[in-house]
A protein has these predicted regions:
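Extracytoplasmic ligand/sensor domains, especially the bilobed periplasmic-binding protein
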Residues: 96-199, 246-272
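Solvent-exposed, acidic/polar segments of extracytosolic/periplasmic ligand-binding ectodomains
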Residues: 337-412
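Extracytoplasmic "Venus flytrap"
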Residues: 33-56, 74-80, 103-104, 170-178, ...
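N-terminal secretory signal peptides and thylakoid transit peptides that target proteins
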Residues: 1-16
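Extracellular/periplasmic ligand-binding modules, especially the Venus flytrap/periplasmic-binding
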Residues: 183, 228, 233, 280-338
Length: 412
């Protein structure tokens, strides 16, 4: 299926006619803009976002709530300023009704004010915490998770079930990595553990040798907060440096995504990660999704693919609730935050801030039919962005970052 960028130009008279004939206007196509990443270190996941969304639309014959759906795809390159420009083009040139995306936290933060200004309906994949916390964007809803939402259950599991006491954390030096590691550290230390080392390599660092040479070995494990293909690159060098038998790696939701797991070998076996999705989730919707995706692309869908497949399900459920009238933006936002919908990740709902409440899965890498998969070993149901903390108390603190919570147990 190919996509072409279309320009919709409205003359003043046409606009007036549309206002006079709302039913006829609503019978036109729903224009969905996908802002993803198809170049750079985040490209493997960004390409999967497009593939999965196209699959979902094809399954619905490109129709939702009785209206045709047109998809317009933009590549931000993972550059925040470019993402904002692409979003503005989608709104002002292509007249999209709704955006799915962007992929990365930094791009979502860069576009936050424009989303507000344009009142752009947004179903986000990006995990930027404060867009559904201290500075909630009224046009922004997220069916995936915040940066830390999957990391906090893993921290609980690491302390209470794996009995880890001393850990290091490493993540890309971007907001997503900072927020994820901060949430992990807070919960791990609240449960009695200590994070004794933190490292934040640049997103595009060509080699992790310097960081591997610095890694403490008198620790139980290291938490990996990488995005895109960086988790694969780090673990490959981690294994080459002979660290696999000395320090146990565990990872956040994108560290060993299926998009990169297919390129790994036995070094990945046994590694535990946490995510709101696994291709191994046993429900009919996911089975259909995985079988269709594998049939076309010859590998399992992961976080990024499931993100757009899930957001499309949220979009369809919301459109069905409002009779397809996506032009009524306040009605759409009220409806989307009130729905409960079954998806490939399981049932989900939304909190008053527009963020998802749903299951988080602990996964272990195993081999199945000759390929590596993220097998589910434990499920935390109904996880919110606030974990077990009271929302009002959680929101009194600063957003998770390199500076908060204070890293009080770091060792030189």
């Amino acid at each position: 299926m190919s996509f072409t960028r279309r320009r919709f130009i409205q003359a003043t008279g046409a606009t007036a006619a549309a206002a006079a004939l709302p039913v006829r206007a609503q019978a036109g196509p729903i224009r969905v803009g996908l802002v993803t990443v198809k170049t750079g270190p985040l490209a493997s996941g960004g390409i999967d976002m497009e593939r999965a969304l196209v699959q979902r639309l094809n399954e619905r014959n490109n129709t939702m709530a009785g209206r045709r759906v047109e998809l317009i795809v933009a590549d931000s390159g993972g550059v925040p300023a470019q993402a904002r420009t692409k979003i503005q083009e989608l709104v002002e040139r292509d007249n999209i009704h709704i955006m799915i995306g962007p992929l990365d936290t930094a791009s979502a933060l860069a576009a936050d004010d424009y989303i507000r200004q344009a009142q752009l309906l947004t179903l986000s994949v990006a995990a930027a915490e404060d867009m559904t916390q201290r500075k909630p964007n009224p046009w922004f809803t997220r069916g995936t998770s915040t940066s830390s939402q999957s990391a906090m259950p893993l921290a609980d599991y690491a302390a209470k079930e794996l009995k880890y006491k001393r850990m290091a954390v490493i993540a890309d030096d971007i907001a997503y990595g900072h927020e994820m590691c901060a949430g992990f550290m807070r919960v791990f230390e609240d449960a009695g553990g200590k994070v004794v080392q933190r490292m934040f390599p640049p997103l595009t660092v060509p080699d992790y040798g310097t960081y591997l040479a610095q890694l403490k070995t008198d620790i139980d494990a290291i938490f990996l907060g990488f995005a895109g293909s960086n988790g694969f690159r780090y673990l490959r060098q981690f294994n080459e440096y002979g660290l696999m038998g000395k320090v146990k790696p565990i990872g956040g939701m994108t560290a060993l995504d299926e998009a990169v797991l297919r390129n790994m070998g036995d070094e990945a076996l046994g590694i535990i990660t946490s995510c709101w999705y696994s291709a191994e989730i046993d429900n009919p919707i996911n089975q259909k999704f995985v079988s269709g995706f594998r049939a076309q692309w010859k590998y399992d869908p992961g976080f990024y693919a499931a993100a757009t497949y899930t957001e499309a399900a949220v979009l369809e459920a919301t459109l069905n609730k409002i009779g397809g009238k996506i032009e009524d933006k306040p009605a759409f936002m009220k409806a989307v935050r009130s729905i409960k919908v079954d998806t490939c990740r399981g049932p989900l709902s939304f909190d008053p801030y527009g963020n998802v409440v749903g299951s988080v899965y602990l996964r272990r890498v195993t081999r199945k039919e000759g390929r590596l998969v993220n097998s589910v070993i434990h499920t935390y149901p109904n996880v919110s962005q606030f974990w077990t903390y009271k929302p009002e108390e959680f929101l009194k603190n600063p957003v998770y970052s390199r500076d908060w919570p204070p890293a009080k147990n770091l060792e030189s």
